[in-house]
Every structure is written in structure tokens, then in C-alpha cells.
């Protein structure tokens, strides 16, 4: 597969306890960041715009809610809602966003991660499963890992709820747990 834009992609999935952790990540990132960041944080769709606005006020990066057809750009942190997927349009990765009345989560982390797994050969990807209840994102993390992406789960020490990260670590052969401050450093290094 030929090289895609953006060349580096960071995926973050979170649930209970995630907003505060995502705020810490967003606030720590420097300008001139060389990766696109896509965040799937479980919350009602009506709260996504205000969450994106709050992050944008605290980050040196541009933060916005992902919209249908938006091309992913380096140095931008996107907050997804609904049934968001990443698809290819020429040499660019773009968002495809649909409503799914049967979805258990908003947004669905597995849907996002599974869609990105198709592009591991054309784009360098690192994915993170942060604090949260249940197992959303685990299946997608495993698909990313099997394709060659690096996947990291938040540690029990810093996760508010060690459900999703624990399931990812249990099921993924190479998924390791890291404290939140270590995750922030990994993200900063990846986007340098």
C-alpha cells in the first residue's frame, strides 16, 4: 500500500473517567505536531461539541468535532461521535460518520479502530485504550495490533475504571499497560 496522508495517526478510546485524561493529553501536546489524533470518548452526542470546545481552549493543537468527509490532518485532534469510521479517498484518510440506532456506545470505539486497521500498511498508527467500563475497543485494538500497529492500554494504577484496558491487555498478546503520564510521553514522541 502506498503512503497515505496523514503519515502518522493516533487513536484514543475512552469511557468512564476519560474526559479528564483526554484533557491532560491535549494540554500536554506541542505545536507542530506531526500526527493526526482521533479520540472516541463515550458520551452523549449532545455533549461532544462542548467537549471539543473545552479541549480546544486548553490545547496548542486545533481541536474539532469530526464531520462527514473531513480529511484527517496532522496537528489536529478530532473528537468523533456516532458510528465514525476512517476511510480512504485517494491518498487521504477521511471520516465517514453514520448513525446506528443499534449501537451500544456513542461513539463506538471498535468501529473506529477496526476501520483504521485497514490502513496500517500505509500509515503509522498507535492506539490507546484508556479508562472505562466494558470491552469497547478491544476487538479493534487486536485487529490493529495484528496488522502491525502499536496498541497500549492504560494501567490499573492511573485508570479510573480498569475495565476496557484490562480486557485489551488480557486479549492482546503485545498490548502493554502504561500509566497516563507514560502514555502522554509516548504520544508526544510519536508526533515529534
Model-derived features: positions:
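Conserved acid/base catalytic micro-environments in cytosolic active-site loops
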Residues: 1-192
Amino acid at each position: 500500500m502506498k503512503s497515505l496522508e496523514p503519515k502518522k495517526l493516533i487513536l484514543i478510546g475512552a469511557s468512564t473517567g476519560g474526559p479528564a485524561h483526554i484533557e491532560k493529553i491535549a494540554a500536554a501536546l506541542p505545536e507542530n505536531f506531526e500526527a493526526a489524533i482521533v479520540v472516541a470518548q463515550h458520551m452523549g452526542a449532545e455533549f461532544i461539541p462542548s467537549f471539543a470546545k473545552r479541549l480546544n481552549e486548553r490545547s496548542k493543537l486545533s481541536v474539532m468535532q469530526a464531520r462527514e468527509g473531513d480529511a484527517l490532518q496532522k496537528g489536529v485532534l478530532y473528537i468523533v461521535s456516532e458510528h465514525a469510521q476512517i476511510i480512504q479517498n485517494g491518498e487521504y484518510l477521511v471520516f465517514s460518520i453514520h448513525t446506528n440506532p443499534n449501537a451500544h456506545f456513542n461513539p463506538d470505539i471498535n468501529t473506529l479502530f477496526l476501520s483504521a486497521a485497514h490502513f496500517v500498511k500505509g500509515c503509522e498508527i498507535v492506539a490507546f485504550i484508556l479508562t472505562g467500563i466494558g470491552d469497547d475497543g478491544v476487538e479493534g485494538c487486536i485487529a490493529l495490533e495484528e496488522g502491525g500497529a502499536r496498541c497500549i492500554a492504560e494501567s490499573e494504577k492511573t485508570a479510573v475504571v480498569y475495565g476496557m484496558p484490562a480486557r485489551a491487555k488480557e486479549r492482546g498478546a503485545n498490548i502493554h499497560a502504561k500509566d497516563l503520564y507514560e502514555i502522554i510521553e509516548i504520544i508526544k514522541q510519536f508526533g515529534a
